[in-house]
Amino acid sequence: MAPGDKKQIIFVITTIGRPSSTVVPFKNLEVSEWSYKKGIKNGYDDYRDPPSPKPLPKSKQEPNADDKVGDIEYDEMVSVRDGYYSDVCRLTCTEDTKIFIADHISLWRYIMDNAEKLPNYVVIMEDDNTITGEGFITNLDNITKVLNDNNVDILQLVTHTKLLKDRNSQHLMLLPDLEAFKGSFDVSLSAYIIRQEAVRKLYSYFTNNKPSFDISLEILRIENTLGITRYVVDNDRYVYHDYKLANEFMKNKKNRLSIKSRIDGWIMDNWPSFYHRMYYPLFSVFGKYDITMMFLIAIVIIIGLAIFDINNKLLWLLSGVFLAYSM
């Protein structure tokens, strides 16, 4: 099959459980759902070790601390997933970050294994995004041609901030109403188009240097070294990241009925992007306690009160309430 004859495909990574038909509501091309668990079932992982001999049964055998990750049973899925990131990440990354790393790296492996069947540029989206304009689908070949002609390796379809684009660089007109700027610090793998050559570079790097943090941050550090050119679209006219969907999923996982959860719900409904930034776990302590931006702000306030020797009891009370609320 000639390269030009390869049909476009969109990979939808399962993060919150939305049907792929709602992520891509148009039937113009093939959509394939993905998660690292699917990769394990299909054998697309490098981390499956030969089964070790089972020990002889012992009476009153003490539980092994290595058999658990936090409160999660250390089963085969978790064992294989742990192979995608470093031991540091295993202790400090949140559960969402670990799944995120495994989902993307396992999909990159699948793309490499099926390179001959797939187009040069592949679309990858997490399922808290929605393609809102059919023009993106019908013009996908034209968009990838612009990317190829300008030697762009990654096109971010979503950015969480519009202030960090390098607007002094050459901008690309992808469509009459959609342009892209060279990416700066706004790295996001929520939705992106990636060239197969970039997939190979990233996969090779992360298998030899297992990530200790969110791979979005790792890419920011290594993209120039790997020679990867990344651009970011300047609007959400065609691909929309819905913070409310991600926030609702995060809220349902907590499943708490309290005044705090009602306040959280009100903030989530009125300022979804603010809620996502403040409440989304940044890292974890020993894989058990998630640390958010809200918690860090509360700690900084308390440290500031202590450093400047503030004796106002009301301020200390309010900062204590804020700290308790952030936990």
Curated annotation (Swiss-Prot):
Q: Which GO terms describe its biological process?
A: symbiont entry into host cell; virion attachment to host cell
Q: Return the InterPro entries for the record.
A: Poxvirus_P35
Q: Where in the cell is it found?
A: Virion membrane
Q: Topologically, how does it sit relative to the membrane?
A: Single-pass membrane protein
Q: Which residues cross the membrane?
A: 291-311
Record's keyword terms, sorted = Host-virus interaction, Late protein, Membrane, Transmembrane, Transmembrane helix, Viral attachment to host cell, Viral envelope protein, Virion, Virus entry into host cell
Asked if the record carries the keyword Calcium, the reply is no
**Record bears the keyword Ligase:** no
The annotated regions of Basic and acidic residues compositional bias extend over: 59-69
Choose one Gene Ontology CC annotation of this protein and give it: virion membrane
Q: Where is this region: Disordered?
A: 41-69
Pfam families registered for this protein in UniProt: Pox_P35
The UniProt family comment states: Belongs to the poxviruses protein p35 family.
Q: What does this protein do?
A: Envelope protein that binds to the cell surface to provide virion attachment to target cell.
According to UniProt, the name of this protein is Immunodominant envelope protein p35
Protein species of origin: Fowlpox virus (strain NVSL)
Lineage of source species: Viruses, Varidnaviria, Bamfordvirae, Nucleocytoviricota, Pokkesviricetes
